[in-house]
Design a protein with these regions (language model features):
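P-loop NTPase switch module centered on the Walker A-proximal segment
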Residues: 1-110, 114-117, 156-159, 165, ...
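Short hydrophobic beta-strand that contains or immediately precedes a catalytic carboxylate
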Residues: 91-92, 200-201, 438-439
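Conserved beta-strand segments of the P-loop GTPase G domain that flank and frequently precede/overlap
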Residues: 92, 116-119, 145-147, 399, ...
Length: 743
């Protein structure tokens, strides 16, 4: 039996890596991850048996309890005994809703294995596929837990034979995901086999579960479970005593998830691109507590009393109170003021945490998710971890302002803290209107951000606009060369703009090409995989967050290096707010072709170079058949046969497109695409058109050109909302051939 253990005992076991497991729970929304976590906390004695299954203890943010869904990733260290041996299981509970995949991305970095929770009725859903794919990209081993088996018996009234067939289908679908997305080196080994105890079955709400080895050992048959539900009441409670869920899950974790020492050998080459033969490389591969300190931050929160708390995994060395470290991203030294373990919402202070474990540290005010923190001796010699790639990007925005202007400083301060904790939430001030813009992954993301704001400020009164869809500006053809002249007429810059090819956009989206990458490596990748010219690939000056690239293709220009930063600033200014509607640009290559620079520094400052750059780049964009891109979602609907017409109607009336319809047993799966702009009240429609019988989910798919017949109307609407003149700016040629942009 599992007993409650104090922090000191957990601390003792943590140094023996054979007895440590770092795992997370992953799933589609509402498939039962947090309810499963409650059963695991019950095992550790952290919540009472009465409330397990209903407590949602890891959903300790109040809104998570209200909505019954997890919005942030929570951490907890559990104690478990297996075969008379004690183990520490560091558990991360992650959100399943598509709007919160950012939290999942960050959590995966610290895990070695994941329990993927799948609802027995709904099966593998879109989000399940996304999180399994993300896990496999980070070399995190997935195991399967099929939850809510009681629904097959009670709601669908399936016979034991039909239940078995349903479970086998889910296992087959799960293994297919591993076949498609896993690295060839682990593909066969990581497919799950129920006979080996790599799949658990159960009902988290009723706290029972089993693996086939447990079933055989205890002499249970599946028909016994069907009979138990027929009897109901006390019999179900007895089942939870006979087959406790935590035992099935934690035994499966201990037996089939590798310990950190084993896992880091194959995970480090995947998530860290430094020299594996260096001292720090070898130390991380070996998960060596005697090596130099390396901590990768997966999550930051701003504690109202303690300040910024950074949680992450120690990949090498030991992290301890008073240690001086270096933050690679923030490029600064820091001092660790306190080290602790997470026990759900509580932090238990301990003196040190060694390699292979998850720690929370205080004192590093500028640490952010994805930060690499290292021993001070590695300053200047350490390569950071692969950057965290977020599957989606913000596509919906709202404007917010305080009702009372005296509250503005408090609003700004709170929004700043929220953006630190959730890097996928973008906060921006609109200088012209004084509004603050909050952009998120979807409506739910924004609703929860507003609720969070309200809680943190004690009910600060604010005005918000309805959700607005975000667009991107792009071009369809290459422009000719345009010349911009500085206001003092002493400097000239010449640019061409052209669309980036699909291969380049793919490399940018996959994080294989980025701004602060070693330039030779980046040039090689662009030449080999995106057909770039060698000189252009070497001449990249800047890459912005929306995938626009500035390239210097000029030759032998005097004083060019003195104005390089001003040109980069002008480029960023242009692509941050394009000429059509001041929306961010996407997929544009801007080439500096030539320049004439004044010899006197006083005549070539930013006030001269930036306007010239802006005029020439905007002229290029406006002449290259500019258009808007809108965000498109992938939608998957699981529905009984008789309700398919309702789904088709809901999609067809909203510019949606049906990609495929597939029959799986008694449910049909409709897969399609739909613009975000058409989904703002889709839930209501979907409920009424399908009599509430549709299980559906969406996920960001791509940016796609707005239909030509809607383009001008959308541009006009955005310009009006932003208080811009109704007409798009135009290019005016000066007598000397240079250009100016006129409103």
């Amino acid at each position: 039996m599992v007993k409650f253990k104090q922090t000191e005992e957990i601390e003792k076991i943590m140094t023996n890596l054979e007895q440590v497991r770092n795992i997370g729970t992953l799933a589609h929304v509402d498939h039962g991850k947090t309810t499963l976590s409650d059963s695991l906390l019950l095992a550790a004695g952290m919540i009472s048996p009465k409330v397990a299954g209903k407590a949602l203890a890891l959903d300790y943010v109040e809104i998570e309890q209200l909505r019954q869904m997890t919005v942030k990733a929570a951490n907890v260290s559990l104690y478990h005994e297996r075969g008379g041996k004690p183990y520490v299981i560091n558990l991360v509970d992650t959100p399943g809703h598509v709007d919160f995949t950012g939290h999942v991305t960050r959590s995966l970095r610290v895990m070695d294995g994941a329990i993927v929770v799948v609802d027995a009725v709904e099966g593998i859903m879109t989000q399940t596929e996304t999180v399994v794919r993300q896990a496999l990209e980070e070399m995190v081993r997935p195991l399967l837990y099929i939850n809510k088996i009681d629904r097959l018996i009670r709601e669908l009234r399936l016979s034991p034979q039909e239940v078995l067939q349903r479970l086998l289908n889910i296992i087959k679908d799960f293994n297919m995901l591993i076949d498609i997305h896993a690295s060839p080196s682990v593909k066969n080994e990581w497919k799950v086999d129920p006979n080996k105890g790599q799949v658990a079955f159960g009902a988290a709400l009723h706290k029972w579960g089993f693996t086939l080895p447990i079933m055989q050992k205890k002499g249970f048959k599946f028909s016994n479970i069907v009979e138990t539900y027929e009897r109901g009441g006390e019999a179900i409670e007895e089942l939870a005593r006979e087959l406790p869920l935590y035992e099935a899950i934690l035994n499966m974790v201990v037996d089939h998830i590798p310990n950190p020492k084993v896992a880091q050998k194959y995970r480090i080459p995947k998530i860290w691109k430094g020299d594996l033969d260096s001292e720090v490389g070898r130390s991380m591969l070996e998960c060596d507590p005697n090596g130099p300190t390396v901590l990768c931050v997966s999550k930051t929160i701003v504690d109202p009393h303690a300040g910024l708390v950074a949680t992450g995994r120690v990949f090498s060395g030991v992290i301890y109170e008073g240690e001086t470290v270096y933050l690679l991203g923030a490029k600064e030294n820091g001092k660790i003021l306190q080290v602790s373990l997470y026990m759900g919402p509580y932090r238990e202070i301990i003196s040190r945490v060694s390699a292979g474990n998850i720690a929370a540290v205080l004192g590093l005010e500028h640490a952010r998710a994805g930060e690499t923190i290292v021993d001070i001796s590695l300053k200047g010699a350490m390569v950071p971890f692969e950057r965290l790639r977020y599957i989606s990007e913000p596509v919906v925005t709202i404007a917010i302002e305080p009702i009372h202007s005296k509250d503005l400083p408090r609003l700004i301060d709170t929004l700043r803290k929220m953006a630190i904790e959730d890097p996928t939430l973008r906060i921006k001030i609109n200088e012209e209107t004084g509004e603050y813009l909050i952009s998120g992954m979807g409506q739910l993301h924004l609703e929860i951000a507003l609720w969070d704001l309200n809680q943190r400020t004690g009910g600060l009164e604010v005005k918000t606009t309805p959700p607005i869809v975000m667009y991107r500006e792009t071009i369809r053809v290459a422009s000719k060369m345009f010349e911009g002249k500085s206001p003092n007429k002493h400097n000239r810059v010449m640019f061409i703009v052209e669309p980036l090819n699909e291969e380049t956009l793919k490399l940018l989206a996959e994080g294989k090409v980025f701004e602060d990458q070693e330039w030779r490596e980046r040039a090689r990748i662009l030449r080999e995989y995106a057909d770039w010219d060698a000189d252009e690939a070497r001449g990249i000056w800047a890459i912005d967050e929306h995938f626009n690239i500035l390239v210097d293709t000029s030759k032998g220009i005097q004083y060019l290096k003195d104005i390089k930063d001003h040109i980069i600033n002008g480029f960023r200014w242009c692509v941050d707010e394009g000429p059509l509607a001041k929306e961010p640009c996407r997929g544009i290559k801007v080439k500096l072709v030539d320049a004439v620079v004044h010899e006197d520094p006083a005549h070539r400052g930013p006030a001269q170079i930036i306007p010239a750059t802006k005029d020439a780049i905007f002229a290029g964009i406006l002449s290259a058949r500019p258009t808007l891109l809108e965000p498109i979602l992938k939608i998957e609907v699981k529905i009984p046969q008789e309700q398919i017409a309702g789904v088709m109607k809901a999609l067809n009336t909203r510019r949606g497109k049906i990609v495929s319809i597939e029959q799986t047993g008694y449910l049909n799966i409709v897969r399609g695409e739909i613009p975000v702009a058409e989904t703002l009240d889709l839930a209501t429609d979907m409920r009424s058109l399908t009599s509430g019988k549709a299980f559906w989910a969406t996920e960001f798919l791509k940016w796609s050109p707005v239909p030509e017949n809607m383009l001008h109307e959308i541009i006009a609407r955005i310009r009006e909302r932003k208080g811009l003149p109704p007409n798009i700016p135009r290019v005016v040629f000066n007598p000397d051939g240079s250009v100016a942009i006129k409103s």
